[in-house]
A protein has these predicted regions:
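Single conserved hydrophobic/aromatic residue that forms the stacking wall/gate
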Residues: 526, 530-538
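Alpha-solenoid helical repeat scaffolds
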Residues: 379, 408-412, 441-445, 474-482, ...
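Short coil turns that delineate tetratricopeptide repeat
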Residues: 403-405, 437-438, 471, 505
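Interfacial juxtamembrane loops and adjacent helix segments
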Residues: 101-103, 232-274
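Hydrophobic alpha-helical transmembrane segments in integral membrane proteins
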Residues: 200-213, 359-391, 408
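Alpha-helical transmembrane segments of multi-pass inner-membrane proteins
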Residues: 17-33, 46-61, 65, 70-102, ...
């Protein structure tokens, strides 16, 4: 055992494994309170930064014909160790040993349970490869305990997608091991999945029904551009418009009160269809078939493990958004590398290899520089995001060349300009943001800007759009009510007031209490004035 540990440490000391370890660590644990997005943006920024360093290092080694170290078992151990620390972190939150403030419950080092659960799901199969390489019963027992630890952490996260993904991996792995007939295996597997699906549905029924609405509206988007899709990041750019149009046509829809402000279709396959159309889905299918061919062409147990990891991602992708997280991409590319490895022999001429290495080094340095600028801009944005002074508004303008394609930055910039009374500039930035992002809050902001510009028809249009996007919200209706009062349309104002008072409440809040109380006071005052005028006349 001591000898094997020594050789493992010796392997890990090689630069490729150090960088791969760092890549996995930052993609899972990186966060920054000095960025406006505490979890996701830091993970992506620092993961890409380490990946670029990784690319430069292997390009330099290849240029000088040095041996590249890509031992699958060693890299699998790295993934398992990183996932183990993540599982322990989540369990520590569950036991309240670690203080955390997150409304979603057990999230580990992620923004919600989905990231936590998917990282453990895709790391689970690599424990099997580690067990396969170990002869010591003690270490096999330790690895089996780790597998149980991963499964337990997924369960306490209450991630339904994680439970289904984990169950898929376990069922496929146990399929050949169970000493029963194939027919019984199929029946048992189907029963387990159906039970898990129904259980997941009724565990959080409102959430599941909300996803059905999202998938319904997403299908309408696909129908409008079935072959080539709507382009990159199409869901964020257009989905809320489709949801608003659908709910305006069917205002009494049973899912209307569940509609919310969303930026993901909760299904990665739908996302591909929305962005790239059926052509993109077809390419994805051919890619999967190609990997299966490579798997059977040169079968090895490590390829089976990689395929199980990809299965976890594939199942998780049916109900959530695993590709939002950089660690999933790292493991997915690693899985693909393992499956392709040995299936084909690539012979690259020496000159071409050298040219590719030089290009990779130069491109890596350029990306590294641009990324450092982006990270610096993210820190500067966070420093000014919550204090819209004149100086900070000028700082927003200075950051536009770097962050001008980020809809969240543009929205905050438009809000800052609006707060300082720069209506025209605020409108221009908000409309620029609108090309990237269809959003409830953005519609309210546009309505406020047009209202202050005395363009009441445009203001009402945006308020109504916001109301149809999220029918359960009271703020758009109250803004329309206030607009009618402002222009002196008493009849429409009274009708809107009655609508607000009769509207059912989805989630009780101080804002809703204030709106209803204010509208009720206004109606009481109006009623008092009318009674007084009738008494004077009589």
């Amino acid at each position: 055992i001591k000898l094997s540990v020594f050789f493992m440490i010796k392997k890990l000391s090689k630069i490729e494994y150090i960088l791969f370890s760092l890549l996995c660590i930052v993609s899972v644990f990186a966060f920054s309170n000095s960025m406006t997005d505490t979890y996701i943006v830091p993970k992506w920024c620092y993961t890409i930064l380490v990946f670029v360093l990784y690319l430069i290092v292997i390009s330099i080694k290849s240029l000088y014909n040095k041996i590249l170290n890509f031992n699958v078992l060693t890299m699998s151990y790295i993934i398992v160790v990183v996932c183990t620390f993540q599982a322990l972190y989540g369990i520590s939150q569950w036991l309240q040993l670690v203080r955390f403030d997150n409304k979603y419950g057990i999230t580990g080092s992620f923004d919600n349970p989905a990231g936590f659960a998917v990282s453990l799901c895709i790391g689970l199969p690599f424990i099997l490869l580690c067990i396969k390489s170990i002869s010591s019963r003690f270490w096999i027992f330790v690895m089996q305990l780790l597998a149980l630890l991963f499964i337990f952490a997924i369960v306490i996260s209450e991630s339904r997608s994680g439970m289904i993904g984990g169950m898929a991996i376990i069922c496929v792995e146990l399929y050949k091991r169970l000493p029963i007939r194939i027919n019984f295996k199929v029946i048992i597997t189907c029963c387990l999945f159906i039970s898990l699906l129904f259980g997941s549905y009724f565990l959080k029924k409102d959430s599941a029904d909300g996803r059905l609405l999202i998938w319904n509206c997403s299908w309408r988007m696909i129908i409008d551009s079935p072959m080539y899709g709507h382009g990159f990041d199409a869901f964020r750019a257009h989905y809320m418009d489709y949801q608003a149009n659908y709910l305006s046509q069917y205002p009494n829809n049973e899912y209307a009160m569940l509609a919310d402000n969303v930026i993901s279709p909760f299904n990665e396959y739908l996302n591909v269809a929305l962005s790239c159309g059926f052509l993109g889905v077809l390419i994805l299918v051919f890619g999967v078939l190609f990997l299966i061919v490579c798997y059977y062409k040169d079968y090895k147990y490590e390829k089976r493990v990689a395929l199980l990891s990809l299965l976890g991602i594939a199942v998780f992708s049916m109900f959530s958004y695993p590709l939002k997280y950089p660690f999933v991409w790292i493991v997915m590319y690693f899985d693909v590398y393992v499956i392709l490895r040995g299936s084909f022999i690539w012979v690259i001429p020496s000159l071409v290899k050298r040219i590719l290495c030089v290009v990779a080094i130069i491109a890596g340095m350029v990306v590294f520089y641009k990324l450092c600028m982006r990270i610096d801009a993210e820190y500067k944005w966070n420093a000014i995001a919550y204090f819209p002074t004149n100086e900070n508004v000028r700082a927003y303008k200075d950051l536009m060349p770097i962050l001008g394609d980020d809809p969240y930055f543009l929205y905050n910039y438009a809000v800052a300009l609006y707060g300082k009374g720069c209506l025209e500039e605020s409108l221009n930035v908000a409309l620029q943001c609108r090309t990237y992002w269809a959003d409830y809050d953005l519609e309210l902001l546009l309505g406020d800007i047009y209202l202050d510009k005395n363009e009441h028809i445009e203001a009402e249009s945006h308020y109504r759009k916001a109301s149809f996007m999220c029918p359960s919200r009271f703020t758009p209706l109250y803004k329309i009510y206030s607009l009618y009062r402002r222009i002196g349309d008493g009849k429409e104002a009274t009708a809107m007031a009655q609508l607000i008072l009769e509207k059912p409440i989805k989630i009780q809040s101080n804002t809703i209490d204030f709106i209803k109380a204010q509208v009720r006071r206004d109606l009481d005052r109006k009623s008092t004035r009318l009674n007084s005028s009738h008494m004077n006349l009589s």
